[in-house]
Amino acid sequence: MNGLSAISLSNQVNDEVELETLCQEIRERALTGEFDDQAYVSLDIIEKLKKIGVYRALVPARFGGEECSPREFCELIEKLSMADGSVGWVASFGMSPAYLAGLPESTLAQIYQDSPDVVFAGGIFPPQPAEITPEGLRVKGRWKFSSGCMGADIIGVGITPSQGKETKGLPRMAVIPADQVQIDMTWDTVGLKGTGS
């Protein structure tokens, strides 16, 4: 079997029990208002999502991922979303392959070199100017939304390469380690408050 399904029936049952246990914990903590009050999913929950394989689910096997089917992934996200909508949102947006698939193979190898359990957050719009320098692109700007950014390992931001005031080429995405990004907590909404978007 492939993806989030286990090789043996006993493993499959254990995996299912682990997922159900996590979903119960998520439900209980969501009911206390924890995620909404802090406006993001708690980092220990992100770590538990990593442990059960959410973020490696769609990562190619050559990078240590599970390569599960879209159906399997959607079923997993449905279960998490039934426990708490914000957790489901962050789990689905945090999977990196959909956003990073257009990157060069060497960049992907670098991103996944330590683990396939990489949590992504994207602050794509509005694209900000990125200064073209001899070393590459210097990225600086402010992006409005980035679901799951508080628990992300890497953050993708929309940029437009520029020299002076002139734009060079099409908009693209720069991928930055999360520890090199300043996050301003401006997320104050009624719905999906716990996503930290």
Feature locations, PLM:
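Acidic, low-complexity intrinsically disordered regions
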Residues: 18-19, 85, 183
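Residue-identity detector for glutamine
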Residues: 12, 24, 38, 110-113, ...
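DPxDG-like acidic metal-binding loop motif
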Residues: 142-181, 185-187
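Short secondary-structure boundary micro-motifs
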Residues: 11-12, 23, 31, 94, ...
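Glycine-rich flavin
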Residues: 43-51, 56-152, 163-167
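Internal glycine-rich alpha/beta core junctions
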Residues: 194-197
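Alpha-helical interface subdomain recognition
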Residues: 1-59, 65-75
